[in-house]
Amino acid sequence: DCPVGLRQGCILSPVLFLFFINEIAASVDENGIHGIQLLPGLVELFILLFADDIVLLSDTARGLQNQLNLLNDVCKNLFLNINKDKTKVMVFRKGGFLARNEKWTLNGVDLEVVNEYTYLGFVFTTRMSLKRGVDALAVKGRRACVDCIRHISKLSDISCFFKIFDTQVQPVLLYSSEMW
């Protein structure tokens, strides 16, 4: 039993979480935290937010640690807990190993460095190869297609099959297609 907070499923929960997420994003922005340059001098990306997922982006080890420290401080001030077991670090590089001093912590706890990470259903790898992610999506698409074909014999009209395909299979096949 949790003595504070809202019950799971409470209609206020998403609204309050939006306030918290906006506070976190504003704090990162206001504190001069740097991210990665998408367009030099024009676009800098330092945080990705979706639902209750937060991705911090930095082009240096120190920059990422600064972001983690700030996130931890803001969450403490908002009485939010970060699940350290779900918090991972991924370093994108062409090759080689991490230096011994390339470690990241959150509130004194070492964070796991991973070689691949699934974000919003797409698998990213440290070498930024899209192959692993595309292969995983192809498997999902194949499964959806097989499920659709399995039910075709039960349909009296082929147009129903195409409608089912367009709504159940095509979205799976096209998911993240902008990336590949």
Residue ranges and their predicted role:
Residues 32-49:
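Active-site nucleotide-donor binding segment shared across nucleotidyl transfer reactions
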Residues 5-6, 47-77, 92-96, 126-131:
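Catalytic palm subdomain of template-directed nucleic-acid polymerases
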Residues 3-34:
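Conserved pre-motif C helix in the palm subdomain of viral-like polymerases
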Residues 81-115:
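Short, conserved micro-motifs composed of acidic
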Residues 51-52, 83-88, 92-94, 118-180:
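Non-catalytic, peripheral interaction segments enriched in hydrophobic/basic residues
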Residues 12-20, 47, 64-67, 137, ...:
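Hydrophobic (often cysteine-bearing) scaffold residues that line and stabilize catalytic clefts
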Residues 12, 45, 111-112, 118, ...:
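Short, isolated positions in well-ordered beta-strands
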